[in-house]
């Protein structure tokens, strides 16, 4: 996602009306946003409801299928709906077809190596693709193309998920890497 922001000059966080400028609903959810291409996030900005200890947010979901990152609940889009969460959670909804690589390592803010283990979250219901971009995390060598790209594709109709061989400056990624794929 960071590379996309750099290469395409598109911020990581976008208001809903950025991709849906003709949708009236996109303008009505002022605190809701897209995080990258995979997530719709709707922070709760109202006090808790008395008796249920939950805050409420009205969420607009564009057409499509969405899965709650934390609860696994599935929602159909093309509508407004109310969501309730306690103070420790907010609605984070993954689009169908999203492929989300994550690390299981605690790297900290001073991390300068690419992770030795990945947990790839794959959200079914639609086709999807993602290119994992990795560089040296230290220099501007990426500006000269010194990086590694690993393409991942989900074909929902065929029920296949493919991780293509990494391409580029392969010494930038660990020689041994554990990959755990989780389907949602």
Segments and roles (model prediction):
Residues 1-184:
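Catalytic core of carbohydrate-active enzymes
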């Amino acid at each position: 996602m960071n590379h996309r922001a750099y290469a395409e000059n598109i911020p990581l966080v976008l208001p809903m009306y950025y991709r849906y400028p003709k949708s009236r609903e996109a303008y009505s959810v002022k605190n809701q946003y897209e995080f990258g291409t995979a997530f719709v996030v709707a922070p709760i900005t109202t006090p808790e409801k008395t008796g249920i200890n939950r805050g409420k947010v009205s969420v607009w979901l564009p057409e499509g299928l969405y899965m709650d990152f934390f609860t696994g609940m599935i929602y159909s889009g093309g509508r407004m709906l109310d969501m309730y969460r306690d103070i420790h959670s907010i609605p984070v909804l993954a689009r169908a077809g999203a492929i989300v690589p994550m690390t299981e390592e605690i790297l900290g803010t001073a991390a300068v190596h690419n992770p030795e283990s990945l947990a790839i979250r794959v959200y079914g219901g639609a086709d999807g693709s993602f290119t994992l971009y990795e560089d040296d995390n230290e220099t501007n060598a990426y500006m000269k193309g010194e990086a590694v790209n690993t393409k991942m594709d989900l074909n929902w109709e065929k029920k296949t998920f493919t991780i293509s061989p990494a391409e580029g400056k392969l010494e930038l990624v660990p020689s041994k890497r554990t990959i755990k794929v989780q389907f949602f």
